[in-house]
């Protein structure tokens, strides 16, 4: 039986083309905030026949897995001949745009080529033009690089990307099978629920199932941590969630969450976890010789957590 691997183009290429350093000009919270504006400024220059934010997808079978890959290309440009199609991938940066060369960021080319493959396959095109457009957010200066590729070359490129991603996808799939089985067999870690605990746990699961938000106020001592963590874990086993972020403002509440997680593990729960903390405390501990991840803002925290939690 073939199992599906659903993944976005960006997630796929960022894994395959990952490197040991991160270019801050593309990763800061400021760049993320201004990125949308930069994209819109470039897209306003498009012609009447051009399109922006075009959804594309493809299904690629490989070994025992079916890769369902999708994304949105920033621009789909039509040449004056009405035949040549260009995929435009826009990247905004706060760095010096003059320092960016054609081969500076292979991951950007990979993303654009994946989109080009999908467009060529969907429209039956034998050749595609691929363009990277960089915009400096302060000066609004732009720099473009253009290459061309045949549909056969793009197909081979796409297959190579999938082949390189496959070992991780297979390992993750096998892990998820074991994880979900452990969740199915997982029991509540206490002999009985405290007063109000079952009601809160039920509300948490229902909220997750309905894709809504829950704000709960409960007295101290009813077991709020386990009442939220346990149903959330069960929701992962049902395919309703992929990951859980448990954010706390104090060390004591963080410890409570870690202890609750340990109880679930002792009951057979098989899942990966990681911990990250704010810059100030991390920096203080770093001076004492301890190694910690250093993050500085809610956006940075979420980005760091997403990188750390590669298998769930």
Language model region names:
Residues 180-181, 187, 240-312:
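A substrate-engagement module of RecA-like helicase motors
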Residues 1-79, 83, 106, 110:
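Metal-dependent nuclease catalytic cores that hydrolyze phosphodiester bonds in DNA/RNA
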Residues 174-217:
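Conserved pre-motif I regulatory segment
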Residues 205-206, 225-240, 260-264:
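Walker A/P-loop NTP-binding motif
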Residues 58-155:
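Mg2+/Mn2+-dependent nuclease catalytic core
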Residues 153-185:
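Polybasic (Lys/Arg-rich)
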Residues 209-231, 242-244:
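Walker A/P-loop
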